Amino acid sequence: MPGQQRRGGGSGGNEGGRRDNRREGGRGNAPVEKTPHLERVVAINRVAKVVKGGRRFSFTALVIVGDGDGTVGVGYGKAKEVPAAIAKGVEEAKKHFFKVPRIGQSIPHPVQGEDAAGVVLLKPASAGTGVIAGGPVRAVLECAGIHDVLSKSLGSSNPINIVHATVAALKGLESPEAVASRRGLPVEDVAPAAMLASRAEVAS
């Protein structure tokens, strides 16, 4: 009997060890791909498709991806599982990266963006102000590397509309050099002195 107990105990221990090994080699310690980008999941929704046999459920994910240094993109993923939907959203966002003109950690000038029923107003702010914005707008701005800005949502409260309106606003921004080139004037004539001083301070 004692021998059987030892064998049983040994067997249980080995099996437990195998379980632990499987657990250690499973998802918990699986190598995770590190990315230099910031990722924010703004919204996850469950959607249903009615088919002959009933309803098929899937998930959609609205994802913001940026490098925190002036580049940002928005993606929308759909899959049967939430992680897969998020992964698709991330890949979609990376395909739609665009550059955002900045002055320090703020924006060059006030701008308003519209998309569907979403309307978002952005205004530059002094250093140390922070991001004064709601969740969807904040996610886009932080991923773009904008940390001092005032914002207000003037339209729909739908996160998708707000995000796309914010993107439209950011795409409407122009750097002082772009404005000066378009008008055929020197930068000093189109940019406020405070803006030029702020840029010089950041550069130094």
Swiss-Prot record:
Where are the residues of the annotated region Disordered?
Answer: 1-34
- The protein's gene is named rpsE
- Listed name of the protein: Small ribosomal subunit protein uS5
The processes (GO biological process) annotated in the record are: translation
Tell me where on the tree of life, at the top rank, the source sits.
Bacteria
Q: Keywords, A to Z?
A: Ribonucleoprotein, Ribosomal protein, RNA-binding, rRNA-binding
Q: Which HAMAP family match?
A: Ribosomal_uS5_B
Disulfide pairs? none
Locations of Gly residues compositional bias? 1-15
Indicate the quaternary assembly.
Part of the 30S ribosomal subunit. Contacts proteins S4 and S8.
Which residue range or ranges hold the S5 DRBM domain?
37-100
Q: What does this protein do?
A: With S4 and S12 plays an important role in translational accuracy.
Q: PROSITE patterns of this UniProt entry?
A: RIBOSOMAL_S5, S5_DSRBD
What family does the entry list?
Belongs to the universal ribosomal protein uS5 family.
Which residue ranges have biased composition labelled Basic and acidic residues? 16-26
Q: What is known of its domains?
A: The N-terminal domain interacts with the head of the 30S subunit; the C-terminal domain interacts with the body and contacts protein S4. The interaction surface between S4 and S5 is involved in control of translational fidelity.
For this chain, one GO molecular function annotation is: rRNA binding
